[in-house]
């Protein structure tokens, strides 16, 4: 059975501001099932942003586990991400989950991959999902050549990804921490 998939999530950190955004499209095979899904959320008393890509059920399962780790480690983003990654690598059921997360707080942005890796992105820019490469390239160009805010860069990057990736639409949700 096919899984729901296809999305773009992008995060940009500039100075003391970070933005995390995603599109709203959920695809099953070659059919758009939903155009306004919310794949970017605020968690842990609105102090942490999280965006997810991959199989929808898998992503929600990982999001729930990440929230529990964040609570257990009193909001320490890095510790929660590493603990989730450890579980992901050692738990047979979790290893089958096909999803990725981008998490960000006031000081740190991390990508948690389907292999159980935790990555600290270079230059404060990261993207995941089917349109991730387009969004990341656009964000990098905008960071290097403009003075736009992280929110504006995320918005424009998602727009470019939506123009190029058939699994990404123009219904955007963007959250920021300043």
Swiss-Prot record:
EC number: 3.4.25.2
GO BP: proteolysis involved in protein catabolic process
Signal peptide: none
Residues annotated for Na(+) binding in this entry: 162, 165, 168
Function: Protease subunit of a proteasome-like degradation complex believed to be a general protein degrading machinery.
HAMAP family (UniProt xref): HslV
Protein name: ATP-dependent protease subunit HslV
Species for this entry: Burkholderia orbicola (strain MC0-3)
Gene: hslV
């Amino acid at each position: 059975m096919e899984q729901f998939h296809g999305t773009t999530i992008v995060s940009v950190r500039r100075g003391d501001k970070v933005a995390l955004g995603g599109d709203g499209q959920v695809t099953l095979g070659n059919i758009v099932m939903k155009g306004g899904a919310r794949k970017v959320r605020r968690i842990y008393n609105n102090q942490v942003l999280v965006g997810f890509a991959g199989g929808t059920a898998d992503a929600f399962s990982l999001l729930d586990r990440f929230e529990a780790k964040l609570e257990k480690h009193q909001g320490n983003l890095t510790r929660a991400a590493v603990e989730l990654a450890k579980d992901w690598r050692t738990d047979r059921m979790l290893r089958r989950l096909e999803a990725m997360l981008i998490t960000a707080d006031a000081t740190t942005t991390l990508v948690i991959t389907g292999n159980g890796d935790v990555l600290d992105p270079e230059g404060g820019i990261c993207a995941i999902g089917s349109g991730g490469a387009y969004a990341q390239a656009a964000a990098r160009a905008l960071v290097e050549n403009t003075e736009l805010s992280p929110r504006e860069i995320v918005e424009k990057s998602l727009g470019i990804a939506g123009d190029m990736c058939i699994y990404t639409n123009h219904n955007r949700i963007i959250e920021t921490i300043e």
